[in-house]
């Protein structure tokens, strides 16, 4: 057993209001520059829908993630090394800019410079940020399907409608929707790492964050295809691939990510999970896709177990990280209460950004008396959002974990309503789903109140273990892709626009 630590995230979809604050703040901090105008490290999608980029869940088209071979071994869906090498100069499974959208701005200056004698009111026409030319019509955007925008024929192409009679959901009275914030999953078994020909992508040992070494990256873009969540973007200005860095400078300081910090709905939780690194391959190679969720749970370790603590210390896990794991809200929601579920575990990457399925539309339907009663709790299998749809999204089609999570959330609400409204203790619903009163009270504290100190338990990094950064700063300066060499742009056969270094010139004002 080799114990490692990972900073994971849980998003409570029951409280997401689709305000896109997380997307905007992430965009302003990390990708508001030339070359990645189209890139959104964090975006919020409306489901059902094809998402961003279009149809990203269709792995028959994009070949992302892993497949299990007949001999039980894993292989990237793109193919083995020889097959990857054969596609290195022409990757047929790479999403194009039209699968994302052509980034644009508007000619606002025209509103000020238009001649006064014009017969029509001046307008700000869209202009492409890639070509610089004016656009006749905006065809697409990062949240083009926001709030069920578009006709149902396009929304019905959502892969999560598999095994569902989707025709009935085209009728207005049967319409449903939910918000799905997405970011890099920082997987335990990342396919992007395996498909990178340059070996530029790595997973940090201390916190599990997956990063791209900008010095090693050569812009082959195989990682974009390899990532089944399509959360790696190509910077056409620098010729490098970029992705969500989980705000690691903030994580190292014990602070939450920008998207978590600015979330107005308090839906995001950050915490440490201890896992057995030796069990990753066995878990990801599970034959039945529906068992992948449980196999990933088996990889996680109990931070309160004395044997686990002893082994973690031997493996170099700092005591502060172990203590943070014991207080982790992610561990509580994923392991203790089993409310949080992984996004598309069938990709076999063992994702580490998990989701609590939405309950709000279900609860409102129950209040209106539209549902049959199953004992104390309503029958959650006949609710507005199809349970099979949530299962296709979160548990590879297995409805049992989704039903358990929904019933436990309903039971907690039933218990708290009896306590606050009726002034009595009614534990019948809790007993039906296997929860104690203490667990229900703690669930209420974390899910409903969601205090800052409960949502974010992030240990600061141990700077005493890091090497001195001043010599690196003094020797290398600001470089991208060319190590510690000069700022001259070298010849590049595949991308002449690549920037190897940025010149930083200092200007000194003359003394009077």
Swiss-Prot record:
Induction trigger: By nitrate.
Keyword Secreted in record: no
Membrane-topology descriptor: Peripheral membrane protein
Keyword field: 3Fe-4S, 4Fe-4S, Cell membrane, Electron transport, Iron, Iron-sulfur, Membrane, Metal-binding, Nitrate assimilation, Oxidoreductase, Repeat, Transport
Localisation per UniProt entry: Cell membrane
Residues engaged in binding [4Fe-4S] cluster 1: 16, 19, 22, 263
Main location: membrane
Domain of life: Bacteria
GO cellular component, one term: NarGHI complex
Record-level GO BP terms: anaerobic electron transport chain; anaerobic respiration; nitrate assimilation; nitrate metabolic process
Pfam families: Fer4_11, Nitr_red_bet_C
Required cofactor(s): [4Fe-4S] cluster; [3Fe-4S] cluster
Residues involved in [4Fe-4S] cluster 3 binding: 184, 187, 192, 227
Residues binding [4Fe-4S] cluster 2, per UniProt: 26, 244, 247, 259
Co-factor note (free text): Binds 3 [4Fe-4S] clusters per subunit.
Known catalytic reactions: nitrate + a quinol = a quinone + nitrite + H2O
The protein's role, per its UniProt record: The nitrate reductase enzyme complex allows E.coli to use nitrate as an electron acceptor during anaerobic growth. The beta chain is an electron transfer unit containing four cysteine clusters involved in the formation of iron-sulfur centers. Electrons are transferred from the gamma chain to the molybdenum cofactor of the alpha subunit.
Assembly description: Dimer of heterotrimers each composed of an alpha, a beta and a gamma chain. Alpha and beta are catalytic chains; gamma chains are involved in binding the enzyme complex to the cytoplasmic membrane.
Protein name per UniProt: Respiratory nitrate reductase 1 beta chain
Source organism: Escherichia coli (strain K12)
The organism's taxonomic lineage, starting at the top: Bacteria, Pseudomonadati, Pseudomonadota, Gammaproteobacteria, Enterobacterales
Gene coding for it: narH
